[in-house]
Amino acid sequence: MVVLKQEEVPECLRYLPRNYNFETGKVLRTIRRLGAKRVTLQFPDGLLRYSFVIMDVIEKYTGAECILLNDVVYGGCCIDDESIASDLLVHYGHSCLVPVGEMSTKVLYIFVDIRIDIDHAAEMIRRNFQGKIGVIGTIQFNSSINRLKRVLDEERGGVECTLPQIRPLSSGEVLGCTAPKIEGVSAVISIGDGRFHLEGAMIRNPHLRFYKYCPFSRRMTQESYDHSTMLSDRKSEIRKAFSGRSFGVILGSLGRQGNRSILRSVVDRLKEYDVYLIMLDEISPKKLERYNFIDSFVQISCPRLSIDWGKLFKKPLLTPFEVFYSGGEYLMDYYSREGSGEWKNYR
C-alpha cells in the first residue's frame, strides 16, 4: 500500500474544482482504518465527471479496488448499499437520509461542500431585502449558508437571517420531497443553481415570496410556482383514483426509495379495493401501461414523480401522502422526523 504524502495531494487532485470539497483525505483514512479491499462509489450525475479522478487517487494510495455504481442517483434516497458486495460504500453529494446503522455495509457520506463568494451573496441580499428573511439550500451549500447568516447578522439593524429547519435535515437544508413550514419572514432565498429542491419549499409554503441566488452566475432571480394548478391537478387525480376498483401499489427498488412500513400503511388504507403489489426500480408511463387491468397506482419511491410528471401517466399515480390526504395544506415531509403521518419514512 502506498502511503499518501502531503506534497502529492495537490498534484493528484488538480483536476477537481478547488471550491468543491470531496474530503479525499477523509475517504482515504476511512478505507485504511477499515482495511477495505473493495470500495464502491456513488455519484449524482452532476458530480460524475469527477469520479474517475477520485477512483484513481483511492486505488493509487490505498490499493483498494474501486467500483463505480452506474444506477441513476436522484438524491440521498438512492443510496445503494445492497447491489454489490463491498467493504465500503462512499456516497457523494447528499446528506444522510438513511442512517448508516441501517445499512447492509459500511457507508461514508461525503456532502461535497461547495464554497461560494459569501461577500457577493451578502451584498446582493443587502441591496434587495429588508427585515427578516429565510435562507435555504441543499447540503452542498449548507456551510456557505451558515457563513452567510453570520455575515448578515453582524450588521445590526440590517437584514435578519434565519435558517428554517425540518429534522433530521440540517438548519437551512431542504429537499425536493422534504421542506419545513416557514413563518415570520418576508421572503426566502435559496442558494444554488437548480430549482428541484427549491420547489419542495415553494410547494410547502405557497404564502411566501421565493428568490434564488445562483453562486455560479452570481445572479438573483425571483422564482414562482403555480400552486393552484398543482393542487387542482393532484386533487383531481385523487378523486379519479378512489373512484376506481383497483390499485397497484409500487414499492420503489432504486436504492432505498421504497419503505415497507409505508407500504403496509398504504395497503391497509386501501383494504376496500383490489390491491396489486409491484416492485420497480424506475417508474415510467411505458412500464405502467403493461398493467392495463389496474385502475390506479400509488408509488412509494419519490413523491415528486407524481407531482411533477403525473400528467404523463394515463392513469392516476398517487403519492403515499395523497392516499391519506383529506384537504388543507399539502405537506412535503416525506423524510421528516417531526409530527406524525402514515405516509412518512420516519414517524
Curated annotation (Swiss-Prot):
UniProt pathway: Protein modification; peptidyl-diphthamide biosynthesis
EC identifiers of the protein: 2.5.1.108
Segments forming a coiled coil: none
Keyword annotations from UniProtKB, A to Z: Cytoplasm, Iron, Iron-sulfur, Metal-binding, S-adenosyl-L-methionine, Transferase
Biological processes annotated in GO: protein histidyl modification to diphthamide
Listed GO MF terms: 2-(3-amino-3-carboxypropyl)histidine synthase activity; 4 iron, 4 sulfur cluster binding; metal ion binding
Binding residues for [4Fe-4S] cluster: 77, 177, 302
Gene3D superfamilies named in the record: Diphthamide synthesis DPH1/DPH2 domain 1 (3.40.50.11840), Diphthamide synthesis DPH1/DPH2 domain 2 (3.40.50.11850), Diphthamide synthesis DPH1/DPH2 domain 3 (3.40.50.11860)
Pfam families (UniProt xref): Diphthamide_syn
Chief place where the protein resides: cytoplasm
Textual note on the cofactor: Binds 1 [4Fe-4S] cluster per subunit. The cluster is coordinated with 3 cysteines and an exchangeable S-adenosyl-L-methionine.
GO CC terms: 2-(3-amino-3-carboxypropyl)histidine synthase complex; cytoplasm
Reaction equation(s) it catalyzes: L-histidyl-[translation elongation factor 2] + S-adenosyl-L-methionine = 2-[(3S)-amino-3-carboxypropyl]-L-histidyl-[translation elongation factor 2] + S-methyl-5'-thioadenosine + H(+)
Names of required cofactors: [4Fe-4S] cluster
InterPro entries linked to this entry: DPH1/DPH2 (IPR016435), DPH1/DPH2_1 (IPR042263), DPH1/DPH2_2 (IPR042264), DPH1/DPH2_3 (IPR042265), DPH1/DPH2_euk_archaea (IPR035435)
Subcellular localization(s) per the UniProt record: Cytoplasm
Quaternary structure and partners: Component of the 2-(3-amino-3-carboxypropyl)histidine synthase complex composed of DPH1, DPH2, DPH3 and a NADH-dependent reductase, predominantly CBR1.
PANTHER family: 2-(3-AMINO-3-CARBOXYPROPYL)HISTIDINE SYNTHASE SUBUNIT 1 (PTHR10762:SF1), DIPHTHAMIDE BIOSYNTHESIS PROTEIN (PTHR10762)
Annotated function: Catalyzes the first step of diphthamide biosynthesis, a post-translational modification of histidine which occurs in elongation factor 2. DPH1 and DPH2 transfer a 3-amino-3-carboxypropyl (ACP) group from S-adenosyl-L-methionine (SAM) to a histidine residue, the reaction is assisted by a reduction system comprising DPH3 and a NADH-dependent reductase, predominantly CBR1.
Family: Belongs to the DPH1/DPH2 family. DPH1 subfamily.
Protein name stated in the entry: 2-(3-amino-3-carboxypropyl)histidine synthase subunit 1
